[in-house]
A protein has these predicted regions:
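Conserved ABC transporter NBD signature motif
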Residues: 56-67, 71-72
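Helix-to-loop junction immediately C-terminal to a conserved catalytic motif
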Residues: 48
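Q-loop/switch helix immediately C-terminal to the Walker
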Residues: 82, 87-102, 110
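Conserved ABC ATPase "signature" region
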Residues: 108-123
């Protein structure tokens, strides 16, 4: 279980949010909503361990997440708002590099399967710089297939996706949750995935 207690975030001299409490259990996902500037991305960066809260605690499996940050991050996959891909590498090479940075190895067949699931068959050997914004986003999202993680932390994952890709991603998140996974997702749009609850910032 992921538990957040009395979490506060300050940027410069501005308080983005304070006193945030929530929990996400296996088989659940949390939809984080709020206006631009309300702190949605900052909250997800706190959950991913990329920044520190002004106050409060994040707990994972009953222990403070920063007590064993390495073990926590091994079970977490964070995908940010921007499509963080290497423009000079191919779509396939991007997935293999991401796996290598996570300490694993991804075969060409495994990478191809993930890219095909996101409608990128035939584009696997193209340098990413030749892909559209939506296709770059799908290369990033293919990591949801190749990287096994209990907790998905996804910042605006539906950005730049067409209707078909949105449906595909909703299905993938739904499958992950149904299999006992967890997800925390920010999105400006309505999301049709069972097992969800909402947090308004």
């Amino acid at each position: 279980m992921l538990t957040v207690h009395d979490l506060s975030c300050v940027r410069g001299d501005r308080s983005l949010f304070a006193g945030i409490d929530f929990s996400v259990e296996a088989g659940e996902w949390l939809h984080v909503r709020g206006a631009n500037g309300s702190g949605k991305t900052s909250l997800l960066r706190l959950l991913a361990g990329l920044s520190q809260p002004a106050k409060g605690q994040i707990r994972w499996r009953g222990k403070a997440a920063d007590d064993d940050a390495q073990a926590y991050r091994a079970e977490l996959l964070f995908l940010g708002h921007h499509a963080a891909v290497k423009e000079e590498l191919t779509a396939l090479e991007n997935l293999q590099l991401a796996a290598e940075l996570d300490g694993g190895v991804l075969s060409r067949a495994e990478a191809l399967d993930a890219l095909q699931r996101f409608g990128l068959k035939g584009r696997e050997d193209l340098p990413v710089r030749f892909l559209s914004a939506g296709q770059k986003r799908r290369v990033l999202l293919a990591r949801l297939v190749t990287r096994k993680a209990k907790l998905w932390v996804l910042d605006e994952p539906f950005t730049a996706l067409d209707t078909r890709a949105v449906d595909m991603l909703e299905t993938l998140i739904g499958e992950h949750v149904a299999e006992g996974g967890m997800a925390v997702v920010t999105s400006h749009q309505a999301v049709s995935i069972p097992g969800g609850k909402a947090l308004e910032l």
